[in-house]
A protein has these predicted regions:
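Conserved phosphate- and dinucleotide-binding cores of soluble alpha/beta proteins
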Residues: 1-127
Length: 127
């Protein structure tokens, strides 16, 4: 999304998760994508979205979500094969070359965050 926005002439930059709160005071708007938008106004998005939305709320920065209309759903089942409980490959967080450390920790790498409806200011869809 950042590349598309940048190509359209919109000033865009990507920030590592660890720096989101520190940079938020200089941000005018947070734009997120969504995996699914549920009936209560909340959404599921890639991990890090909740952190960005929470930091934005603390700095009174609006959060805008861009998603196709097909991602709006009245129901959401957390216990299906593909759900908000999906996990990414643990090696993307902690490489297996870390030998002794890998044997001593369990790495849980969730793929989605649930972003509460009170953290989102507007949804933009294709219709």
């Amino acid at each position: 999304m950042a590349q598309s926005l940048s190509e359209a002439g919109i000033s865009t930059f990507l920030v590592p998760d660890s720096s989101i709160y520190a940079i938020m005071s200089r941000v005018s708007k947070v734009i997120l994508g969504a995996h699914a938008i549920i009936a209560n106004g909340g959404m599921f998005a890639v991990t890090g979205s909740l952190l960005a939305a929470t930091a934005a709320q603390a700095h009174s920065t609006p959060v805008v979500v861009c998603a196709g209309q097909f991602k709006i759903t009245p129901l959401w089942n957390l216990y299906q094969d593909h759900s908000a409980l999906d996990f990414s490959d643990p090696s993307s967080v902690l490489g297996f070359e870390e030998g002794t450390l890998v044997d001593k920790v369990d790495v849980i790498n969730p793929y989605y965050d649930y972003v509460r409806p009170d953290l989102v200011h507007a949804y933009i869809t294709n219709e």
